[in-house]
Amino acid sequence: MGSPSACPYRVCIPWQGLLLTASLLTFWNLPNSAQTNIDVVPFNVAEGKEVLLVVHNESQNLYGYNWYKGERVHANYRIIGYVKNISQENAPGPAHNGRETIYPNGTLLIQNVTHNDAGIYTLHVIKENLVNEEVTRQFYVFSEPPKPSITSNNFNPVENKDIVVLTCQPETQNTTYLWWVNNQSLLVSPRLLLSTDNRTLVLLSATKNDIGPYECEIQNPVGASRSDPVTLNVRYESVQASSPDLSAGTAVSIMIGVLAGMALI
């Protein structure tokens, strides 16, 4: 008895080839109303996590799907395909790297996402009448924010005399910086300055009320992290003291350095 895979009455064409051929017959892409929608979950992805491109399709007469990296339907950019009603449904392409999985409804799962995965993806829906449909979506990838820390030019300022500069470390892109004092958001004060990116906080004249604790928080589209609290040891120094922590010249130098790009809060 012959092999069940043999084709005695017609020429055999591998089903992977049929899928690719159908997807590349762009002249069959006649105008039609879109029936496919894609939800990206989540839209902003944390590096190392996973993302789902969830396909919603109202049409029942589908031959299969192809996913491409980028906006072009091109064989070199094909990630993976799926053919309905065939035992070997998944058809990885040149752009497949082992982390992508396609489901029977066309939904694409990408695991252990890297920054290189960010960008646009195109789904090519292949219908039985070869009137194809293309839908594009994109997502972004961010590293989860690290735990920040606070550095300072002076954790032991002299009351009503010393300038204190607090900086939230590290400096990262696509990050929002927030400050907390005594577990509350920073209050408006004429003695406080913030850099334009909120990363640096300046106390123009420290007082006993400025002891803290101080915390800084960094946020980005995929998370937030807060520093350990720090406190200031605000000291009182008599007028007769001969060795202030900061001379007038030093104070002026600090002010010139930190006020560049600063904004009053």
Swiss-Prot record:
Leader sequence range is 1-35
Please name the Gene3D superfamilies in this protein's record: Immunoglobulins
A GO molecular function assigned to this protein is: protein tyrosine kinase binding
Q: Which residues are glycosylated?
A: N57, N85, N105, N112, N174, N183, N198
Cellular compartments annotated: Cell membrane; Apical cell membrane
A Pfam family of the record is: V-set
Name residues in a coiled coil. none
| Domain Ig-like C2-type, chain residue ranges per copy | 146-233
Q: Where in the chain are disulfide-linked cysteines found?
A: C168-C216
Membrane topology designation: Lipid-anchor; GPI-anchor
Alphabetized, the UniProt keywords read:
Cell membrane, Disulfide bond, Glycoprotein, GPI-anchor, Immunoglobulin domain, Lipoprotein, Membrane, Repeat, Signal
Write out the GO cellular component annotations. apical plasma membrane; cell surface; cytosol; extracellular region; plasma membrane; side of membrane
Residue span(s) of domain Ig-like V-type: 36-142
Q: Which domain of life is it from?
A: Eukaryota
Q: Where is the lipid attached (GPI-anchor amidated serine)?
A: S242
The entry's propeptide annotation covers: 243-265
* Tissue specificity field: Expressed in columnar epithelial cells of the colon (at protein level). Strongly down-regulated in colonic adenocarcinomas.
A biological process (GO) of this protein is: regulation of immune system process
| Similarity comment text for this entry | Belongs to the immunoglobulin superfamily. CEA family.
Question: What quaternary structure, including any partners, is listed in this protein's UniProt entry?
Answer: Homodimer.
- The protein's name in its UniProt record: Cell adhesion molecule CEACAM7
Its encoding gene is what?
CEACAM7
